[in-house]
Amino acid sequence: ESAPDPGPVHVHGLGVDPADETLYIASHTGLFRLPRESSAATRVADRYQDTMAFTVTGAGRFLGSGHPDMREDLPPFLGLIESTDAGESWVEVSLQGEVDFHLLAASGSRVYGFGSVWGSNEAVFFASNNGGESWTKHGPPESLIGLAISPSDPRMLIASSARSLFLTQDGGKTWNRSPGSPGLLAWPQPDRLYLADSKGSIERSTNMGQSWRQAGRLPGPPSALGFGSGELFAATHNGAVLESRDQGATWSERFSP
């Protein structure tokens, strides 16, 4: 008799597929789908891939990174991987065996990633303008825990370390310290940038992170922040997924482990 499915453990990423507004939950124990009107998360493709970084780039199109399912003959660092069938299958784009991306952000053909390099203690910020096929390395300002790309300018990103926020307007070549407390980031609209700090406070900025106001509060510390179709999504450390339909002011449980 097989062991029960553990469900999503240690949620790293949340994203909505614009094809059908299904929420995808990327976790240490695999990728799960949560249809719009459902509270039951189902494992995608019976795969236990540790999806460390995850972002939705289009209808059924995802980028990811992390570590393979133990049953697959793949190196421990997946590099950049892509799915064009909503997570049913993944193919290597680049850097397999070389890089473990912890954070990914993409807009059009521009892809950015922060992660660790195999065989070194080095953490690197990578930028690509051809969908991740080739990369330029930039030194990140500090080790990063959050990354979001502007919906209106693919060269503008805001990043968070454990201590500070940073803004780049040239695709990661240069970074300037930005006001605000550190945290996880989501940037659904040019004038709506969200941050979830380590205590669960939700902050909102309407001016690209130059100033912040508290919008609401999560019931606990967040492990992931995401958005889709007018909603914000957050995962807490116990594995619950919450959603807000009023710009972060109030939150309701969407999935409970």
Residue ranges and their predicted role:
Residues 3-32, 52-53:
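Beta-strand-rich domains and repeat architectures in extracellular enzymes and scaffolds
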Residues 19-21, 59-60, 108-109, 154-155, ...:
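Short coil/turn segments that connect the beta-strands within blades of beta-propeller domains
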Residues 30-32, 67-73, 117-121, 165, ...:
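Short glycine/acidic-enriched loop and turn motifs that connect beta-strands
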Residues 29-44, 77-94, 126-139, 166-177, ...:
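Asp-box/BNR beta-propeller loop motif
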Residues 71-77, 116-123, 160, 197-198:
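Short, solvent-exposed loop/turn segments at conserved positions within beta-propeller repeat blades
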Residues 41-78:
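Blade-loop segments of beta-propeller domains
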Residues 10, 50, 100-102, 143, ...:
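Beta-rich catalytic cores
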Residues 14, 54, 104, 147, ...:
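Hydrophobic core register within WD40 beta-propeller blades
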